[in-house]
């Protein structure tokens, strides 16, 4: 197509994503939009069409972002090209949201007519506003018996500052209001800016690995044009490739002639190495490069680290490959090799949060068939040593000796919780117990309160969310963001089995809670570790000092069962022999530790 056609086409493109709190009906709305624009034939339609991963369907959540092109004939007689980018709603996947927003000009904000605005809704709205997106508010599920659309409209105006008249009332499940939403998209979302005659600039916002075609990158073209046969260059790495195919997702991949300004599609350029197509990088032409790369979105740093070890040592290299492939379209996953005396060779892996960690572990076990043992997660600590140097610790087993450390800093997060009035006391008590500092509290209306605390991340990552939910009967919503590292009085707790340190069970704890945590853990391990032929002491120690101890009793074997009556010295001889055997076994014997024991470190607060 010539330049003029490209300019004309640009005016009719609308790029938008759908943002919402988890479970407010985002993926269902995406399904209806696909259906009403006749992008998918009825026989291929299935619920949560864009959630292509099995895990996403099982858990009913969106994990990966997805982009798809639709055609829409509007009431003004023109045909518009929509690019819909579906995003996850869970706090751990907010980087997926920020990625897809970087490729859009507008966002549909979906709010549940019964639940109203939740913590995650606000977090996503702020992300959208940071990216200068136009917001189109939709109140969804208006056909629910508990729906209060008018109250929610008022909330949108009071809390976010959106005009009530712009709100569309809809029910994605019953197909109500979908036409209004499509018309509103044409009206509210601005067409993309950018010049097709300028040098190429395209943002990579996702990529996946195909064993036959190499890396497939999802891109949004900001300036210029790209087509098959072009020589392209990655601006971050400087590597050059030849494009073999460009195309669009309709949700299936469909090759087309070219991608121009405003287009969202995919590009294949026989890129074999996963590292060469990094999410957030800018693609340009090798012979006519752009002057500066696009500003990618901010790199998300992992918040939580844990060790992943294959149960079979021979799977070590397969695990490395699995992590590399997952890292390709999950920019926030980090890993490096580590070895543990208890578990052998594995990887220290960084995640954004606990759900992210669970999903990655499950994907490795499912998609790559590798059985894993995971150690208890920990956060990153900064240690200032007495000689003035700084040490970063993401693995409790590597914490330097306490007498060499001057001070320890741990990450704090700002936790925002939306809670019904009746549960404010319970939530504040939970935050105090987790060493939180109260910041402020706003009453949104008669029923809900927004509470803000500063809490150490180490207290949040384990089971804070579960406890928050159980303390509020499931009504609270929660969002957190990192603020800074603060000095804390922390100590490293070692666990000794049979007198040997088990490095994978070490954890870092605040000194005030050390005794009770240590006591709770040894008691818990006593129930989890199977009994041996000999008695096994389980001890919790800080440095050289033992703070708690218990014994796992030995299994008794009656060696006297064959002695009928007879001489006492005969019995004594057998008992002495057994005793000597047990002593020898105890000196040499190792204790098998089941996977549950490694996770026991997490679950100590439940008792």
UniProtKB/Swiss-Prot annotation:
Function: Required for accurate and efficient protein synthesis under certain stress conditions. May act as a fidelity factor of the translation reaction, by catalyzing a one-codon backward translocation of tRNAs on improperly translocated ribosomes. Back-translocation proceeds from a post-translocation (POST) complex to a pre-translocation (PRE) complex, thus giving elongation factor G a second chance to translocate the tRNAs correctly. Binds to ribosomes in a GTP-dependent manner.
Highest taxon listed in the record's lineage: Bacteria
Protein name: Elongation factor 4
Catalysed reactions listed for this entry: GTP + H2O = GDP + phosphate + H(+)
Gene name, Swiss-Prot/TrEMBL: lepA
Similarity section: Belongs to the TRAFAC class translation factor GTPase superfamily. Classic translation factor GTPase family. LepA subfamily.
PANTHER family: TRANSLATION FACTOR GUF1 HOMOLOG, CHLOROPLASTIC (PTHR43512:SF4), TRANSLATION FACTOR GUF1-RELATED (PTHR43512)
GO MF assignments: GTP binding; GTPase activity; ribosome binding; translation elongation factor activity
Binding, GTP: 23-28, 140-143
Membrane topology summary: Peripheral membrane protein
The EC number(s) this enzyme carries: 3.6.5.n1
Keywords, in A-Z order: Cell membrane, GTP-binding, Hydrolase, Membrane, Nucleotide-binding, Protein biosynthesis
CC terms in the record's Gene Ontology section: plasma membrane
Domain tr-type G: 11-193
InterPro entries: EF-4 (IPR006297), EFG_II (IPR041095), EFG_III/V (IPR035647), EFG_V-like (IPR000640), EFTu-like_2 (IPR004161), G_TR_CS (IPR031157), LepA_C_sf (IPR038363), LepA_CTD (IPR013842)
Organism this protein belongs to: Staphylococcus haemolyticus (strain JCSC1435)
GO BP, one annotated term: positive regulation of translation
UniProt subcellular location: Cell membrane
Stored Gene3D superfamilies: 3.30.70.240, Elongation factor 4, C-terminal domain (3.30.70.2570), Elongation Factor G (Translational Gtpase), domain 3 (3.30.70.870), P-loop containing nucleotide triphosphate hydrolases (3.40.50.300), Translation factors (2.40.30.10)
């Amino acid at each position: 197509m010539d330049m003029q056609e490209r300019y004309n086409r640009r005016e009719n493109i609308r790029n938008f994503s759908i943002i919402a709190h988890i479970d407010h009906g985002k993926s269902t709305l995406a399904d209806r939009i696909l259906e009403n624009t006749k992008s998918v034939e009825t026989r291929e339609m299935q619920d949560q069409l864009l959630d292509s991963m099995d895990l996403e369907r099982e858990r009913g959540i969106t994990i990966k972002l997805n982009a798809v092109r639709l055609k829409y004939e509007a009431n003004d007689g023109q045909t518009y090209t929509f690019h819909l980018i579906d995003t996850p709603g869970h706090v751990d996947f907010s980087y997926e949201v920020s990625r897809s927003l970087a490729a859009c000009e507008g966002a549909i904000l979906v709010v549940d007519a019964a639940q109203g605005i939740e913590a995650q809704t606000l977090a996503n709205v702020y992300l959208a506003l940071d990216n200068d997106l136009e917001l189109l508010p939709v109140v969804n599920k208006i056909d629910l018996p508990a729906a209060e659309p008018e109250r929610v409209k008022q909330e949108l105006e009071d809390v976010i500052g959106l005009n009530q008249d712009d709100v569309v009332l809809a029910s994605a499940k019953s197909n109500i209001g979908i036409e209004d939403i499509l018309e509103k998209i044409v009206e509210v979302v601005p067409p993309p800016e950018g010049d097709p005659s300028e040098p190429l600039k395209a943002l990579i916002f996702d990529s996946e690995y195909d064993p036959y075609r190499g890396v497939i990158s999802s891109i949004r073209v900001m300036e210029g044009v790209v087509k098959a046969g072009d020589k392209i260059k990655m601006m971050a790495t400087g590597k050059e490739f030849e494009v073999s195919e460009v195309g669009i997702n309709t949700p299936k991949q469909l090759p087309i002639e070219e991608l121009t300004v405003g287009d969202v599609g995919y590009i294949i350029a026989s890129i074999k190495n996963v590292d060469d197509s990094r999410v957030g990088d800018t693609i340009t032409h090798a012979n006519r490069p752009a002057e500066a790369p696009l500003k990618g979105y901010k790199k998300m740093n992992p918040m939580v680290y844990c060790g992943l070890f294959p149960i079979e040592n021979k799977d070590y290299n397969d695990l490395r490959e699995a992590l590399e492939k997952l890292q390709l379209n999950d920019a926030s996953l980090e890993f490096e090799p580590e070895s543990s005396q208890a578990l052998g060779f594995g990887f220290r892996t960084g995640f954004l949060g606990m759900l992210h960690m669970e999903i990655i572990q499950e994907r490795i076990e499912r998609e790559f068939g590798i059985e894993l043992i995971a150690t208890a997660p920990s956060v990153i600590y900064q240690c200032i040593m007495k000689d003035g140097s700084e040490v970063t610790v993401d693995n409790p087993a590597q914490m330097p000796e306490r007498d060499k450390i001057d001070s320890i800093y741990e990450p704090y997060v700002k936790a925002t919780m939306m809670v019904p009035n009746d549960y404010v006391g319970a939530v504040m008590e939970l935050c105090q117990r987790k060493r939180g500092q109260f910041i402020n509290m706003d009453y949104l209306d008669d029923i809900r309160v927004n509470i803000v605390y500063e809490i150490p991340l180490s207290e949040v990552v384990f089971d804070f969310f579960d406890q928050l939910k159980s303390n509020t009967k499931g009504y609270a919503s929660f969002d957190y963001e990192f603020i800074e590292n603060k000095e804390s009085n922390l100590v490293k707790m070692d666990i000794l089995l049979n007198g040997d340190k088990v490095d994978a069970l070490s954890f870092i704890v605040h000194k005030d809670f050390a005794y009770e945590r240590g006591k709770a853990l040894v008691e818990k391990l006593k129930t989890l570790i199977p009994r041996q032929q000999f008695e096994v002491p389980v001890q919790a120690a800080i440095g050289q000092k033992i703070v708690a101890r218990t014994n796992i009793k030995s299994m008794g074997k009656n060696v006297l069962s064959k002695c009928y009556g007879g001489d006492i010295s005969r019995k004594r001889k057998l008992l002495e022999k057994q005793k000597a055997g047990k002593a020898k076994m105890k000196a040499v014997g190792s204790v098998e530790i089941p996977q549950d024991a490694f996770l026991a470190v997490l679950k100590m607060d439940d008792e």
